[in-house]
Design a protein with these regions (language model features):
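Extended catalytic cores of very large enzyme megasubunits
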Residues: 1-228
Length: 228
């Protein structure tokens, strides 16, 4: 418990204590519920919500109920509040049947979900729907942002090159924080640029000799396995 939650200690003094976790989770739940009620144009009863929240806190503190593990880990954090609730999901699924129209976006979506810890399932319905192409390599430079979104966007760009012949710039990895540096948004430490460089090289090796061929089910599986 302490090992998984210490990065969310509000005072950054070490391991988050149980009462802090309970407060964070309950406040996060009710803040999310309040936003949803307002979005639907419904009435919010603050006094009733306070009573219910206090009861939920007491029951959680005494282990009469618990949210899922990801709820204990992520609910009420800035990550969920500022970057949607994707980090609360355990599993997701994405079909590749619309690969011909959505191209690299499908794999970028799966990569984004995987990078917030979601287990992602997929199919191979997109097999045979596009011809692999040679990217239009340019001398432009894309400085990859030091963020999950930056990594995902770079893979999206590369795959669109092979799926639609789009332009692919030179990738600049210099902005990515070094291995071992802290990751403040999602917690943990950085792996450095190495894994992303390896992913770009592996995807390029997979498709570079298949120009003109129809994408196969094996290609789809290999692409997602390289990403995941």
């Amino acid at each position: 418990y302490a090992r998984r939650l210490n990065e969310f200690d509000p005072e950054a003094t070490g391991t988050e204590e149980w009462w802090q976790t309970c407060r964070r989770v309950v406040e996060g739940m009710f803040n999310m519920q309040k936003q949803h009620v307002f979005m639907l144009g419904l009435e919010w009863n603050d006094a009733k919500a306070q009573r219910t929240a206090k009861d939920a806190y007491d029951r959680l503190f005494n282990l009469k109920w618990t949210p899922p593990g990801r709820g204990l880990w992520m609910m009420g954090t800035k990550f969920v509040e500022e970057r949607t609730a994707a980090g609360l999901f355990n599993c997701a699924f994405r079909s590749t049947r619309d690969l011909a129209t959505k191209g690299g976006y499908l794999f970028a979506w799966m990569m984004d979900a995987l990078m917030v810890g979601i287990g992602v399932g997929f199919d191979t319905e997109g097999a045979g729907t596009i011809n692999i192409q040679e990217p239009q390599y340019t001398n432009d430079t894309l400085v990859i942002d030091d963020s999950r979104e930056g990594w995902v966007d770079s893979v999206h760009t590369l795959l669109d090159g092979f799926f639609s012949g789009a332009k692919v710039p030179k990738f600049d990895y210099s902005a990515i924080r070094p291995e071992g540096a802290l990751i403040h948004g999602f917690g943990g430490t950085s792996s450095g640029a190495g894994p992303l460089i390896e992913l770009h090289e592996s995807l390029s090796a997979l498709f570079s000799e298949k120009s003109g061929e129809l994408i196969s089910s094996v290609d789809i599986v290999d692409t997602e396995n390289l990403i995941g």
